[in-house]
Amino acid sequence: MVNEVPTLKKKIIFKYFKPLLTFTKKEDPYELRVKSAPPLNIIEERKEPKKFVLCKPDGTPITLDDLSDISDSEEEEDTKLDMKDSIKEDVKDSIKEDVKDSSKEDVKDDVIEDVKGSINEEINSTCGTCSFINLKREKILNELLEMYRVEESVPYSFVPTNVPQIMYSVGEILNCINKIPFTLKLLKKDVNKIPVNYKEFKINKETIIEKATFELNKLTNTNIKRIITNLKNLNIETIQQAKYLGNLIVFKAINEPQYCNLYAMVVGALKKDFKSKEELGLHKKQTAFFGTVLTSAMKVLEEKVEWADTKVLDKNLYKNAFEYERAFEEQETERYLRKKKTLGAVNLLCDLYNLDVITLKHIQSRLNEFLNIENEEVVEVLGKFIEKIGEKMYLNDKSDYANMICSYLDACKNKYSNRVKFYIMDVLDKKKNWKKPVSKTENLFSSLIMEDEPALDTPYQYQEQVIANEEEEDSLELLKTIDNIYQDLKDAYDEEDEIMIADNFKIASNTFGKISFFSTYFSECITNSRKSKLLVPFVINFFNETNLNESELFDIINKHKEKLNELKIDFPLSQKIMSLYVINFVVDRLSKKIHMIN
């Protein structure tokens, strides 16, 4: 029997260590944005500097008595007295000799000057401190202050007098005496003086940009209404300033993707009202701000060819591994920045579409171009579009176009890398959960039992039934055509779009008949208050394109006027809409006739 080798069993023990403290970075649109919006001014407490005190060698502070009680030796006092006596005698002898030959009145001033000059010469010839040795230090300092004083009436001494003090004394400066506070007229604030606003000297563009940037930096879900009102209150003067703010919002939406939806809400709120003073005189429907947001976002997509250089770097072209790694990092950094910029613009356009700020017409041309380009990056951009706006396209009855893009992505997903392939599969899986449009009308007669239709005995009855069915089909097509005109008016962007829509009047009048089409058109305006807001002004502005005479229009209005009493039961606003339409039409006709006469 062969001896079996015993096997060693290893037991792996894993112990979970819970970290004591973790740091997480959280960016929530409901929280305050402290980093990007710091306080205007930060008040810091300043420590008062310590007082400088003169001390004796033993460490005790010097007092005023110590300054005045400094005495000299007896020998110095004797030499000082001898010098004073000798100086006085020499001066007296010189004065007597000069006065003998002159009168007292003429020589009085000269004598005083000679005495002062002789005293100064004697003092300078000897030691400079000998003549002042016996004087107190307090007196010496006061004499020095008198030499430099401005007003002779103000005494300078250590102890303040009744005269108002305008400066500190020597004792107060040396901290021998507590300082007495005094007021200077130079430091008083003039109440009547108008304060100078230094911001007025800045350029208006800089102040507006600073205010707008400051408001956008504070943007969150909680304060978005207040920030929109603050932005509307900005006094924008030129079109260039409005364009700069539009580019600023696009830049911030690209670099701050977590707040992109909020920036789209700001654009939607400022779409029509955010105009500069220069734009008010031009009378344009589209604002420069909104046009700049669209053009700058679309320009990012138009300039997108490749996010970065996709060629593979050859290691043999570099000297060492360090240079190769540095070149590879630069390539990946450039790729990341371009990808971030492109997808940021896609997010902004998708959010604008989801908020009904723009329509599919604004981005459909660029999507059609992407469908004709076979590129991994383009496929990823299309997937991003469908992921963001696919459900909204279904709700807006654009499901055919969304399904076409989804089928294109499904067909080409196997051509690219696994990352793109799995991303497209995730997007297509989300399609199952998209909401479908729900019809608002309900079938009120669903519970009733349908009866069999009676047989048509005669050919005349059969012919009448065919004519009735044809008229019903024509009326349905008429309503569908009018509804398409209304949808086109909702999506109209400029006056040029409305001119193109007005061409439908000619096509519809030729196919359905002029009278039948416009009678149905006006009945839709009267019975539907929501549609009348767009359809009625549109007919008034483009009445010349309808090929209707005023007499024909008068007959159509009279027919609807007879039905108003019946329509008021189901449509209470029909009479109001009818009167507004007639008044607006008459005013428009009269204004044009007056203009032609003038």
Swiss-Prot record:
Molecular function per GO: mRNA binding; translation initiation factor activity
Every MIF4G domain range: 209-434
Chain positions covered by the region annotation Disordered: 65-86
Primary localization: cytoplasm
Source superkingdom: Eukaryota
Any GO BP annotation: regulation of translation
Keywords recorded for this protein, A-Z: Cytoplasm, Initiation factor, Protein biosynthesis, RNA-binding, Translation regulation
One Pfam assignment: MIF4G
One of the record's GO cellular component terms: eukaryotic translation initiation factor 4F complex
Subunit and partners: Component of the eIF4F complex, which composition varies with external and internal environmental conditions.
Protein family according to the UniProt entry: Belongs to the eukaryotic initiation factor 4G family.
Annotated function: Component of the protein complex eIF4F, which is involved in the recognition of the mRNA cap, ATP-dependent unwinding of 5'-terminal secondary structure and recruitment of mRNA to the ribosome.
Protein name: Probable eukaryotic translation initiation factor 4 gamma homolog
Gene this protein is translated from: EIF4G
